[in-house]
């Protein structure tokens, strides 16, 4: 390295250090302009069987994503809870036209991804393999190969998973929260057990598929390096054979809040921490006038690391690693507000007091202007 080069490097470094020293770190930097977001306007069409197709062309990268969504209302499974889960596990294991092994091998060979659940499917691939991926997705969705052998395997997996959760505090807490909020006669309140899974037969899975995995309530969203006319042609080719069916019409009791504050305890002798949740039923819809205001209020209360309950219970009191709240919305009916925290057993009562205090404060006292401004900027 020459002396001249050394001087240049030294001067550059010195200039950078000097410039950095001139920055006033006590003043928050002014935000730059908001980024321009262009989501793309979808083009759409419907098949005769009821399948609704949305297409967004984006040719920036040579890839494409497909989302098949079955938009059913919540389904009450009763003493056969686990049927939907087993149905989802058995979908995507090949089809009546291709074995599971050949199906998985081809997807791997294409460097693609294809996943199924009882509520639809998701695929992603390079755009040059788009046609074949749509064909594989449609074939597995329309012609599932439900066999007793695979059913028994998936049933054993599900039961093993349930057994592993029997002493997991967070899993038990989640079940109890839903059961208390919605009641066991509501789809969100029931939960799967080993007994309910053992009640499920292969015939139940086949019946669930026929009744609920139907195109009448289905959407196929295609986004990426595709052409609208090509998507339309391929969809008509591969999805037209999906049998038209009447969409399910379901009814069940609507959950309501308890008239007074109710305290429920579950003794877990193996637990080294207490899991606390304060919850209630809310009937929030995205179409509500105060929807955004409600989301902002929850963000201030417990939506992040700088939220009120986290600053109180973690930063001030040192009770926990994190305390948060969530606010649900559901077009099919009531959902939940929940504020949750895991704390040392010895500070359980104090944590409950602080949670209730923060919830009371945000309900009774106006939010400070600066707090609201900061939350809006972060949201």
Q: What would you call each of these model-derived segments?
A:
Residues 1-24:
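Bacterial Sec-dependent N-terminal signal peptides
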Residues 3, 22-25, 46, 102-248, ...:
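Charge-rich, well-structured scaffold segments of protease-associated domains
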Residues 53, 65-71, 137, 275-277:
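A short acidic-to-branched-hydrophobic micro-motif
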